[in-house]
From Swiss-Prot, chain A:
A family per Pfam: NTR
Record-linked Gene3D superfamilies: 2.40.50.120, Frizzled cysteine-rich domain
Annotated gene: Sfrp5
GO biological process per UniProt: cell differentiation; convergent extension involved in axis elongation; digestive tract morphogenesis; negative regulation of Wnt signaling pathway; post-anal tail morphogenesis; regulation of establishment of planar polarity; Wnt signaling pathway
GO CC terms in record: extracellular region
Protein name, entry field: Secreted frizzled-related protein 5
Domain NTR: residue ranges: 178-300
Organism: Mus musculus (Mouse)
Curated annotation (Swiss-Prot), chain B:
Localisation per UniProt entry: Secreted, Extracellular space, Extracellular matrix
Primary localisation category: secreted
Signal peptide stretch: 1-24
Annotated function: Ligand for members of the frizzled family of seven transmembrane receptors. Probable developmental protein. May be a signaling molecule which affects the development of discrete regions of tissues. Is likely to signal over only few cell diameters.
Family assignment from sequence similarity: Belongs to the Wnt family.
Entry keywords, A to Z: Developmental protein, Disulfide bond, Extracellular matrix, Glycoprotein, Lipoprotein, Secreted, Signal, Wnt signaling pathway
GO cellular component, one term: cytoplasm
SS bond list: C80-C91, C130-C138, C140-C157, C209-C223, C211-C218, C283-C314, C299-C309, C313-C353, C329-C344, C331-C341, C336-C337
UniProt name for this protein: Protein Wnt-11
Covalently lipidated residues, kind O-palmitoleoyl serine: S215
Recorded GO MF terms: protein kinase activator activity; signaling receptor binding
Post-translational modification: Palmitoleoylation is required for efficient binding to frizzled receptors. Depalmitoleoylation leads to Wnt signaling pathway inhibition.
GO biological process: adrenal gland development; animal organ morphogenesis; apoptotic process; artery morphogenesis; atrial septum development; bicellular tight junction assembly; bone mineralization; canonical Wnt signaling pathway
Length: 314, 354
């Protein structure tokens, strides 16, 4: 396959050379794989290694290649460090906010083994950011410094370009449900959401206002129960205003009718309360009752995912 | 009766040769240790070149350290040649270890630099080997006593500088501790310069941090004490080489000390390199002073620095010539995952000193 491809390319080069009336100075293509000596980049203590992508690095195990360079392009120096830092990106992958999210993240977390580092192109970064940054912002997480797109090269032949983002959609686009309104049905899923939230409160909602691109949930004065206080003080709960970031124009079935109580989870970010999940309170729901009862017994991981979505990769 | 003068001459010659011998950096010959020598048995220690008996003894009792020290010898040579690539004296004579020329045999400014760099390199390499887990006898450096700063926490694996300094000095200073060898002045100079190298290494220990927060945020930053790269330490020592101080061996009180030759009102500073003998200009080849000369050295026509053709060639002029360079071009990355390149030729104009 490679040989045939190379032969065609060489033939094309010769043809172009003939058309220009002079032999081209370029010759047949050479292929370059892994070499032990690093050409560029910082190598701390050891030259870069080439390792199998382990099965317990689920972010990148299915990316499309099997071996990765260590240290990676985020200066993670051990597999343990890579796994630890990569784990918080799995939920974003599950959200499928862009078809090239995995290609982009893994080009940095588990870069291909070649004789030089291959960075993602700036356009790949910008596409992933355009698709995923609004979702991250909805949960109070800015697009991180380490993924700022100006760090990556303008598109050229030696960077990783958009791979799947060009494919035509197989189905007509449907208006996507608000991220904060995707439902988790199991007790475990609910408790994972509670782990990633600063506070959990059972409350009634008085009204909803639109504020630029956000929705604002104004809490009712009475019938409020703080299930997980976190950073909230007693005074904070007197007048609860929850911001649903980027939630102005997406559907949220739970909020179609404001009667009754809601189970609300959120984070406190720079003095503002951000909604991360909302459920209708259902006292007959056994999963919900179990989650609320055993919330503090659940073993939250130290580096918990910033959100836990119901969407699963297919 | 006639036989005696010959015996006396031989003795005098040996004595003269003996006084100038610089044992302290002969261990850099370890860079030539063949890969086939596994260094996993104590009898391998005798096969190593450039070691005094105390170093052979250290080899036997710290066998697991020797692979790292061989690595350090290579690192020191590479760092020296890199730091001085643009100078007339370009550290090429370091490759002759253990049989140096007079530029490194005598108490010159150049040998001062090499002593300092060697001491820094062996300690640096050992400290890093602790961090990377290559040395079973040591591990990460200690967690510092001071707080790491708001929002930060100590973590990771700090370079074990104290172990590096301890074991590095034990090995590289061993030749200077032997009482019989060399003059006292040379010994003091070499020990001082080695200590300057270690001082530069201590100064290069800095706090490094990484963002370990959720989703790549900097809400949690992990910090550790890490050494700068060896080439940065070498660059620092080169600056000290350029401002090194000539000293003489002079009695002060009941002892003899090294004091600055021209400004003898002050003691020698702990941070300055010192030398006893002035260096030539290294323009012409002169084996009596260990100068290779700059004839046929490449120079930079457009530079204003020490590698400029005027300075490098000492005003003798230079000759241009063209060189054909074959390099990769039109490289392209293909998903997933390989790179193809073409081979391009081009001619470059180079200049060499007359």
């Amino acid at each position: 396959m490679w040989v045939a491809w190379s032969a065609r390319t060489a033939a094309l080069a010769l043809l172009l050379g003939a058309l220009h009336g002079a032999p081209t100075r370029g010759q047949e293509y050479d292929y370059y794989g892994w070499q032990a000596e690093p050409l560029h980049g910082r190598s701390y203590s050891k030259p870069p290694q080439c390792l199998d992508i382990p099965a317990d690095l689920p972010l990148c195990h299915t990316v499309g290649y099997k071996r990765m360079r260590l240290p990676n392009l985020l200066e993670h120096e051990s597999l343990a460090e890579v796994k630890q830092q990569a784990s918080s990106w799995l939920p974003l992958l599950a959200k499928r906010c862009h078809s090239d999210t995995q290609v982009f993240l893994c080009s940095l977390f588990a870069p291909v083994c070649l004789d030089r580092p291959i960075y993602p192109c700036r356009s790949l970064c910008e596409a992933a950011r355009a698709g995923c940054a609004p979702l991250m912002e909805a949960y109070g997480f800015p697009w991180p410094e380490m993924l700022h797109c100006h760090k990556f090269p303008l598109d050229n032949d030696l960077c990783i370009a958009v791979q799947f983002g060009h494919l035509p959609a197989t189905a007509p686009p449907v208006t996507k449900i608000c991220a904060q309104c995707e439902m988790e049905h199991s007790a475990d899923g609910l408790m994972e959401q509670m782990c990633s939230s600063d506070f959990v409160v059972k409350m009634r909602i008085k009204e909803i206002k639109i504020d630029n691109g956000d929705r604002k949930l104004i809490g009712a004065q009475k019938k409020k129960k703080l299930l997980k206080a976190g950073p909230l003080k007693r005074k904070d709960t007197k007048k609860l205003v929850l911001h649903m970031k980027n939630g102005a124009s997406c559907p949220c079935p739970q909020l179609d009718n404001l009667t009754g109580s809601f189970l609300v989870m959120g984070r406190k970010v720079e003095g503002q309360l951000l909604l991360t999940a909302v459920y209708r309170w259902d006292k007959k729901n056994k999963e919900m009752k179990f989650a609320v009862k055993f919330m503090f017994s659940y073993p939250c991981s130290l580096y918990y995912p910033f959100f836990y979505g119901a969407a699963e990769p297919h | 009766m006639r036989a005696r003068p010959q015996v006396c001459e031989a003795l005098l010659f040996a004595l003269a040769l003996h006084t100038g011998v610089c044992y302290g950096i002969k261990w850099l010959a370890l860079s030539k240790t063949p890969a086939a020598l596994a260094l996993n048995q104590t009898q391998h220690c005798k096969q190593l070149e450039g070691l005094v008996s105390a170093q052979v003894q250290l080899c036997r009792s710290n066998l697991e350290l020797m692979r790292t020290i061989v690595h350090a010898a290579r690192g020191a040579m590479k760092a020296c040649r890199r730091a001085f690539a643009d100078m007339r004296w370009n550290c090429s004579s370091i490759e002759l270890a253990p049989n140096y020329l007079l530029d490194l045999e005598r108490g010159t400014r150049e040998s001062a630099f090499v002593y300092a760099l060697s001491a820094a390199t062996i300690s640096h390499t050992i400290a890093r080997a602790c961090t990377s887990g290559d040395l079973p006898g040591c591990s990460c450096g200690p967690v510092p006593g001071e707080p790491p700063g708001p929002g930060n926490r100590w973590g990771g694996c700090a370079d074990n500088l104290s172990y590096g300094l301890l074991m590095g000095a034990k090995f590289s200073d061993a030749p200077m501790k032997v009482k019989k060898t060399g003059s006292q002045a040379n010994k003091l100079m070499r020990l001082h310069n080695s200590e300057v190298g270690r001082q530069a290494l201590r100064a290069s220990l800095e706090t490094k941090c990484k963002c370990h927060g959720v989703s790549g945020s900097c809400s949690i930053r992990t910090c550790w004490k890490g050494l700068q790269e060896l080439q940065d330490v070498a660059a620092d020592l080169k600056t000290r080489y350029l401002s090194a101080t000539k000293v003489v061996h002079r009695p002060m009180g009941t002892r003899k000390h090294l004091v600055p030759k021209d400004l003898d009102i002050r003691p020698v500073k702990d941070s300055e390199l010192v030398y006893l003998q002035s260096s030539p200009d290294f323009c012409m080849k002169n084996e009596k002073v260990g100068s290779h000369g700059t004839q046929d050295r490449q120079c930079n026509k457009t530079s204003n620095g020490s590698d400029s053709c005027d300075l490098m060639c000492c005003g003798r002029g230079y000759n241009p010539y063209t060189d054909r360079v074959v390099e990769r071009c039109h490289c392209k990355y293909h998903w997933c995952c390989y790179v193809t390149c073409r081979r391009c030729e081009r001619t470059v104009e180079r200049y060499v000193c007359k």
